[in-house]
């Protein structure tokens, strides 16, 4: 189980220091007990059809490193030392902190900056207007191809029952302002070929690919799903808001 692991994380970790491995990242911040791996959102970039190719190769345009809105673009996952300071793993961060151990916590962001004590207990997103990707970023592909997003909505969200996978979700994540191919230097072809050639995993993977194509064709028999598909096809890239524009959304209305 995870209890035996030193550190725990998942997703597309993209390290920018040393030999681009997790040990190289930890060597760059040796005193850190936790590193927040800030998302970099990769948008749809006009890809319509689902194809069985790696996300990292298909989607290479992303949000700028500095964003002021939406706050969901500032979410992070956590690479945390598994030393008993927290009793549970959460979706974005460890939970159930041991109060007696918190004084020894040292959290840093993906640029190596020390984060305030509020992060030791409950924060799940970073402050806006800062580049938190100098050492490491988490490549996040929330949309995929248009057909894939239709299937994602059909499936539903794995963690959050509230908040639909609707056009609003799409708009908040469809950033394609900068090209970023940095993760492609970490060649995964040998590993992928090995998995696809596995006598158990290979057929299961192909069955999943075939199912996705069949399911999409089935959904397109219904007017509501065709309408949603059409909405996504008409939607353009998301516009990045300036700091002033972002602050005008919340600053006049939130006190304190």
Regions found by a protein language model. Name each.
Residues 1-14:
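Short beta-strand-to-loop acidic/aromatic patch adjacent to the donor-nucleotide binding site
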Residues 15-241:
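Catalytic-site signature of metal-activated, phosphate-bearing donor transferases
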Residues 237, 244-255:
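Charge-dense, extended regions
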